Design a protein with these regions (language model features):
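Conserved beta-strand hairpin/beta-sheet module of binuclear metal-dependent hydrolase folds
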Residues: 1-42, 122-138, 152-155
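Active-site environment of divalent metal-dependent phosphoester hydrolases
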Residues: 58-62, 84-85, 118-119, 142-144, ...
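Active-site metal-binding motif and surrounding structural segment of the metallo-beta-lactamase
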Residues: 33-78, 154
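Active-site metal-binding loops of divalent metal-dependent hydrolases
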Residues: 7-8, 28-30, 57, 114-117, ...
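Cap/insert and terminal regions of metallo-dependent hydrolase folds
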Residues: 144-243
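Metallo-beta-lactamase
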Residues: 78-131
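Active-site neighborhood of phospho(di)ester-bond hydrolases with catalytic His/Asp-centered motifs
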Residues: 26-29, 49-57, 77-80, 134-137, ...
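Metal-dependent catalytic neighborhoods of phosphoester/phosphodiester hydrolases
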Residues: 63-72, 85-89, 217-224
């Protein structure tokens, strides 16, 4: 199993999961050319991608969708509401609507609702052979039912978008600050740490902090905040890394 985060942040998001001899791409928030170049660095032909999962319709998650579908033709898995929104722009036949739970090629994919200013935003729990990946970005909060479902998993790819103080004192106008801080906005470093303190378990191997704002955050602050909150909750876990907007982060096991 291998995770390759092509990029994560407000300018684009895409993550490749190589699991059970299948390749799953989550989101295509970069141009097809950019994703192709990154995949080729991994010695992967884009046409090897078996499945494309979409979280929601914002441009930093679907920017390269049309070109990717036309050139690669993977099975597209997405919520029906999202398909209906995108249909006119991206008519496509190889589609499977996401249910709460589905299995493809021995890979179990559990879908859960997130809270973001989008039509039907979702996160994923991907499981195979007793290994699991939780993928959560673009949400203002995580409810307790989801926390129960995703407790003690192997890998967490979870949003740590902003430092609240940097955001409030930064250049963003008040209406944009309110959007980011709202229940339909983005997770702060502090809330990311609190949620991780409730779900990290004995089976957890690594945490990757996702979707860091380049304006209202930095990796050192995000890491320090998360580790501090974990320690305050008597959890000693230091295998934490930040995803990057421009450089790939690769995790193998």
């Amino acid at each position: 199993m291998k995770i390759s985060i092509i990029g994560s942040g407000s300018k684009g998001n895409s993550t490749l999961i190589d699991i059970n001899n299948k390749k799953i791409l989550i989101d295509v928030g970069f141009s097809y050319k950019y994703i192709k170049e990154k995949l080729e660095k991994l010695k992967i032909d884009p046409k090897e991608i078996d499945y494309l999962l979409l979280t929601h319709e914002h441009a930093d998650h679907i920017y390269g969708l049309n070109a990717f579908l036309n050139k690669v033709k993977p099975l597209l898995l997405l919520k029906e509401k999202l398909y209906n929104l995108l249909y006119e722009k991206h008519e496509y036949s190889k589609i499977q609507f996401l249910e709460e739970v589905q299995e493809v090629d021995g890979i179990k994919i559990t879908v859960f609702q997130l809270s973001h200013d989008a039509v039907d935003p979702v996160g994923f729990l991907i499981e195979s052979n007793e290994e699991s990946i939780v993928y959560i970005t673009d949400t203002g909060y995580i409810n307790y039912k989801i926390l129960f479902k995703i407790k003690d998993k192997t890998y967490y790819l979870i949003e740590s978008n902003h430092d609240t103080e940097l955001l409030i004192n930064g250049p963003y106008p008040p209406h944009l600050q309110r959007r980011i801080l709202s229940d339909k906005g983005h997770l702060s470093n502090e809330f990311c740490g609190v949620y991780l303190s409730k779900i990290i378990g004995n089976n957890t191997k690594k945490v990757i902090l996702m979707h860091l704002s380049e304006t209202n955050n930095n990796p050192n602050i995000a890491l320090e905040t998360t580790i501090k909150i974990l320690k305050e909750n008597e959890i000693i876990f230091n295998n934490i890394e930040c995803a990057n907007q421009r450089e790939m982060v690769i995790v193998k096991w």
